[in-house]
């Protein structure tokens, strides 16, 4: 099946390298933006039956790339005033629901978004409910009402704000707090503040909509369900939407008027926050890497579910972006994300972002 391309100036061979890393049977999309032009390569089918070819409108599960949308939602709400980035949990959650550490009440919303809260990677108790569906839907049996119960028995791994420790729990809790304050669900809140203003019509947290079928070791997987923490990994999206999203982060004035809350939020999420003890800096959910100096600042995030792998990354100067989506879960020796990241690095280091 021949690849679909938007424009020919960005050599499709550059995208082919990423596509090959997904494996021969995968359905995938690789899209890149550089030097003011976009190129998209689509390959394979939405399922192994070979009925529907993958297009740039095919929905793939994003996994943890969802967290970047949640951080943008947080920044937008902070710009509007209902919440503050430095708002502490003690002002939002009853003391009985907080971890026993006296420092827990001081955890801020920003620390939840930047993985510096000290909370564990997963809510205590989740692994017990996950065991029966570990290879299909490990989060589906963990109910939303269990989230605060898990928080109350959590132990902080470090004082808030002192170290980076990746936490699905933290971002999931952040989403729950934002939706509780707004009095609506995650999908509706994100749609009102981010998806509709940015015209991201293919992006949703609804698992019932049309999407590609995910695969794990060649076996089909059901749609990913994460009812207690949708803000940490529930989104599905298309390459077309994700490339538009990244271009909005590159140049906020092209998608929303200057001075508007969302315009301010698109800038806010890329502001450097903290450097891990070993590794790159963090922005608001995004990993930020400037290495080796004076390399361009790269922002990126990957994600995975039991049936999908996703990568999104961009640079503002030069203006480049890469999206890579496949309906195959990452394997032990998978290089799909690493190859997509390398493409981003290569495009950003070429003069003017123009590929050769």
Where do the language-model regions lie?
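Short beta-strand segments enriched in hydrophobic/aromatic residues
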Residues: 78, 178, 249, 316, ...
